[in-house]
Design a protein with these regions (language model features):
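A short beta-strand-to-alpha-helix junction
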Residues: 6, 29-32, 50-55, 79-86, ...
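Loop/turn elements at helix/coil->beta-strand transitions in domains of secreted/extracellular proteins
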Residues: 6-10, 43-47, 96-100, 177-183
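Short, solvent-exposed turn/loop segments enriched in Gly/Ser/Thr/Pro and often Arg
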Residues: 26-27, 43-65, 102-113, 186-191
């Protein structure tokens, strides 16, 4: 890349525990991922890209380092302290002058403090619960939404993790007028506990019609 060519922004959008065929691009008949589908349909689609591990942490550590779990020594969701590598993707972007951000689920060897901006969410809500709404929603996820919660989530969309995360990610990106950035938007969903504006009982009826 020449000195005159502006550096491209790099955004990784990730979902957690989602089957590859549960999206419109792969022919799934319900519009559950319309925005992701629009990206997939207008860009390159790698239909033979497979994860290196069926567990979260090994796969994420491999994504950041380009190394197999056998090389990183991280083979489970509980041993990132064993992580072995020389340099990861985050360090490379920083060396190239990129601003860096994480919004969402980490679950890798990197730390929140390694990013210029970090808003961490996990399956049970925002890690740093700054507002009463954050606390109330985390209580719901921890105590009422465990297992198979079959009703619509009793919170508006704006209070639920996905919408909050996208809102924060967009706000940060719009502030980066003078710097190229790398941003990792890592959705904890659709991994349970589930959040939905639609009753799961209604969804079951729809699925039976497919």
């Amino acid at each position: 890349m020449s000195a005159q060519t502006p550096k491209p922004n790099v955004v990784i959008i990730m979902t957690d525990q989602q089957r590859a065929d549960l999206c419109g691009r792969e022919g799934f008949p319900m519009a559950v991922t319309p925005f992701a589908d629009s990206l997939a349909l207008s860009n390159v689609w790698f239909d033979k890209a497979y994860t290196v591990a069926p567990a979260s942490m090994p796969a994420r550590c491999s994504m950041f380092t380009g190394r197999y779990p056998t090389a990183t020594h991280v083979r489970t969701n509980h041993n990132t302290l064993d992580m072995y590598y020389k340099k990861d993707m985050l360090e490379v972007f920083k060396e190239q002058g990129y601003k860096t951000a994480l919004v969402g689920k980490n679950h890798a060897h990197v730390k929140g403090k390694d990013f210029d901006y970090c808003e961490e969410y996990f399956h049970w809500g925002k890690n740093q619960r700054d507002t009463q709404e954050d606390k109330d929603f985390a209580f719901f996820l921890n105590n009422k939404a465990r297992g198979q919660y079959l009703e619509a989530t009793p919170f508006p969309a704006e209070a639920q993790n996905p919408v909050k995360m996208v809102t924060k990610a967009l706000a940060w990106a719009e502030q980066q007028k003078d710097s190229a950035f790398f941003m990792w938007v890592s959705m904890p969903e659709p991994h349970n506990p589930y959040q939905s504006l639609i009753s799961q009982c209604f969804l079951r009826k729809r699925y039976r019609q497919l």
